[in-house]
UniProtKB/Swiss-Prot annotation:
Task performed by this protein: Core subunit of the mitochondrial membrane respiratory chain NADH dehydrogenase (Complex I) that is believed to belong to the minimal assembly required for catalysis. Complex I functions in the transfer of electrons from NADH to the respiratory chain. The immediate electron acceptor for the enzyme is believed to be ubiquinone.
A cellular-component GO term for this protein: mitochondrial inner membrane
Pfam families hit by this protein: NADHdh
GO molecular function: NADH dehydrogenase (ubiquinone) activity
GO process terms (BP): aerobic respiration
Catalytic activity annotation: a ubiquinone + NADH + 5 H(+)(in) = a ubiquinol + NAD(+) + 4 H(+)(out)
Enzyme Commission code(s) on record: 7.1.1.2
Main location: mitochondrion
Enzymatic class: translocase
Keywords: Electron transport, Membrane, Mitochondrion, Mitochondrion inner membrane, NAD, Respiratory chain, Translocase, Transmembrane, Transmembrane helix, Transport, Ubiquinone
Family under the similarity heading: Belongs to the complex I subunit 1 family.
InterPro entries: NADH_UbQ_OxRdtase_su1/FPO, NADH_UbQ_OxRdtase_su1_CS
Name recorded for this polypeptide: NADH-ubiquinone oxidoreductase chain 1
Length: 312
């Protein structure tokens, strides 16, 4: 993939994120029995452009006692982390920016760097709301990264590969969600928590922390955090489609990823926020023990399924 193709991919990703926000607002509107955006452009589709113009034209205010260098670098670090994850995604046979034998682990490793962005943003803002939000963010993201990593390791035990392209090929006969349905549900909940999306949006709980680690941000710096959140949501939706639903090429993969992205929105509209201590306890007391037990059971499952599924 040359530089122009890479640049086109990044711009396409940012454009997809922009229109995902419009889709979210329209979906929430219909679920709450109202219209949603409908004035800017045909059916409100240009609302994303209007929002972007509004945010970028605002003044960027840096607090007097803040660490200005870290305050500016943190959102850039978070967005870069969210975009680098896409290097491991197979969009078709041979269409991968970086085809590695450790693709899944590298994707999660790149995504985990975003934790530092939110941590540094909370510290640099010199605000109690930012600090509490960054501490919540760090604890929540690190906890649920363990859940996602354990789920991927269990899937790798069953398929015998960490290469994302090879992984898609092995699901041609049967999607992995069939034998591992409980695991896929834990994976999805872990993805929602990892993206800090409702009902697990304790990182920026408006009623408690104003806007969490983003409290002191405005204008273009806030846009970078906003883009990174939705880019991560699209990435984990695509990874879910690959990990449990056979992936696909081009349009098929896009349709599957869009379905899971809309599932995030439906969950947001239908569920109240989970209390923070309950969220962390669910990870350490419920999910991780269950996943470790399933990892111990996996050799028996491989023996039972040997001969007519993924094992070759």
């Amino acid at each position: 993939m040359n530089f122009m193709e890479l640049l086109l991919f990044v711009l396409s990703m940012l454009l997809a994120v922009a229109f995902l926000t419009v889709a979210e607002r329209k979906t929430l509107g219909y679920m709450q029995r109202r219209v949603g955006p409908n004035a800017v452009g045909y059916y409100g589709v240009l609302m994303a452009m209007a929002d972007a113009a509004k945010l970028l034209l605002k003044e960027m205010i840096l607090p007097t006692h803040a660490d200005k260098f870290m305050l500016i670098m943190s959102p850039m670090m978070t967005l870069m982390s969210a975009l680098l994850c896409w290097a491991m995604i197979p969009f078709g046979p041979g269409i991968t920016i970086m085809d590695s034998n450790y693709g899944f682990m590298l994707a999660l490793a790149m995504g985990s760097v975003g934790v530092f962005g939110s941590l540094f943003a909370g510290w640099a803002g010199n605000s109690k709301y930012s600090t509490i939000g960054s501490m919540r963010s760090t604890a929540q993201l690190i906890s649920y990264e363990l859940v996602l990593t354990t789920v991927i390791l269990i899937c790798m035990l069953l398929t015998g590969t960490m290469n994302t392209s090879r992984y898609v090929e092995l699901q041609e006969s049967m999607w992995l969600v069939v034998p591992l349905l409980p695991l896929s549900l834990m994976w999805f909940m872990g993805c929602v928590a990892e993206c800090a999306r409702p009902p697990f949006d304790n990182v920026e709980a408006e009623s408690e922390l104003v806007s969490g680690h983003m409290t002191e941000y405005s204008s273009s710096m806030f846009v970078l955090f906003f883009l990174s959140e939705y880019a991560s949501m699209l990435f984990y939706s695509t990874l879910t489609a690959i990990l449990f639903f056979g992936g696909g090429t081009g349009l098929i993969l896009g349709l599957k990823a869009n379905f899971f992205a809309f599932t995030y929105i439906w969950v947001r509209a239908a569920t109240p926020r989970v209390r923070y201590d309950k969220l962390i306890a669910m990870c350490w007391i419920v999910f991780l023990p269950l996943l470790f037990a399933l990892a111990l059971f996996m050799p028996s499952l491989i023996y039972i399924m040997d001969g007519y599924t993924f094992m070759e």
